């Protein structure tokens, strides 16, 4: 009799284990895929977006509609491109509305207005205004404007933005390299402009701001720069550049230049707004380097992926990592 009880308990335990295995297996499979993809941003984002779509199949369409409501045609187009890649049907008429919004945003009058704004103010949030910003920086107008403005504040003991000052100082030297290399350093130049613009409009992530601030302070001799910019002027660009060069520590600029290059890579594949989105969520230069890999793989879909997943589009976050390990370990314990 006891033997029958033991057999019954064994069978019941086996059945329970089998049921638990069946319930856990899909989650364990996803967890395993996440762990294996943690060093590949493109594959990682695919896995997580597919999971999000299983939970809410309308997420992409909702994202596109919200982007249109926010007057962000570029983001809306990113969502429709992602929908096409994933084979997701969009609500009737949504794709046509997105195309019309993109056409309007790219109109000649709108582009010219935003280019002029970027050139004069040095602030950008799209391709046209960034083109104006980069043009201003390539003609050294933009960087000298920033060096003079922030440098004067520093010289007068006011609260100067030393990050913008440091980026502008690096930019003056990179601009010279761009001319020498017949444009070869333009992606780095554009990247520096975007980091600077993101800082000005409060779209640079806290972690990246802290890192870039430390790096920027290291590339200039503050007392020498303070003395140099005390007499600097946009009207005397040659004198200003020479003064900044004297205070510049080229050997310390490598990290900022690498960051700018990665930002430029994101911009080339995902657009200016895509690069600015990345700068907002990045916790440091490694995040931006991973974003460059994501953008090179996903192109125009990058903004939608970042919007849906946040920083999770770039790396396996601590919460997701711990959950994946827990599910995987639970399966092995059966």
Label every model-predicted segment.
Residues 1, 33, 49, 117-120, ...:
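N-proximal short alpha-helices
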Residues 1-14:
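N-terminal Sec-pathway targeting helices
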Residues 1-3, 101, 105-112:
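Charged, low-complexity, helix-prone segments enriched in Lys/Glu/Asp/Gln
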Residues 14-38, 334:
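Membrane-interface motif at the C-terminal end of an N-terminal transmembrane signal
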Residues 25-28, 41-44, 114-115:
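Short acidic/polar alpha-helix capping motifs at helix-coil junctions
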Residues 34-107:
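Alpha-helical protein-protein interaction scaffolds
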Residues 57, 69, 73, 137, ...:
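Solvent-exposed, acidic/flexible segments
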Residues 109-158, 169-170, 176-334:
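Compositionally biased, low-complexity segments of secreted and virulence-associated proteins
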